[in-house]
């Protein structure tokens, strides 16, 4: 069953060396994350605190050339990386459905390297609106 609830994504494409890691760790912290959820804000917990890896890998033009995949998934074929990306997005979609917050915060430094065209595709159906803050 697809939830038709409209959700807003707040995309924090923090640049490298600007304190983004501190923001991510604060939002990811269990205590703070529960407070955010009570405020109807989801900071996904099924991904690492820094969302760079799952987001950039899923949305870039050539995930097999992404440094994160080269460092952390060395030896995986393009097909396996694509499968991993689909799993990461499915896990996000399931968490969004389960936690039912109307706002979703995604934060990752590598997101700032994505082209705008890459962010306009592959989004789960129930996510309808994106606001980007840099």
Set out the residue ranges of the language-model regions.
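PAPS-dependent sulfotransferase catalytic domain
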Residues: 32, 36-37, 103, 111-112, ...
């Amino acid at each position: 069953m697809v939830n038709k609830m409209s959700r807003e994504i707040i995309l924090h494409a923090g640049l490298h060396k600007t304190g983004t890691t501190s923001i991510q760790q604060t939002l990811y912290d269990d205590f703070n994350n529960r407070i955010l959820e009570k405020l109807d804000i989801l900071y996904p917990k099924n991904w690492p605190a820094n969302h760079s890896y799952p987001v950039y890998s899923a949305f870039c033009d050539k995930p097999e050339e992404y440094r994160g995949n080269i460092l952390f998934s060395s030896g995986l074929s393009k097909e396996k990386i694509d499968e991993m990306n689909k799993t990461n997005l499915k896990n996000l979609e399931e968490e969004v459905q389960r936690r039912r917050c109307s706002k979703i915060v995604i934060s990752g430094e590598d997101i700032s390297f994505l082209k705008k065209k890459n962010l306009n595709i592959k989004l789960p159906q129930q996510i309808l609106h994106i606001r980007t803050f840099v």
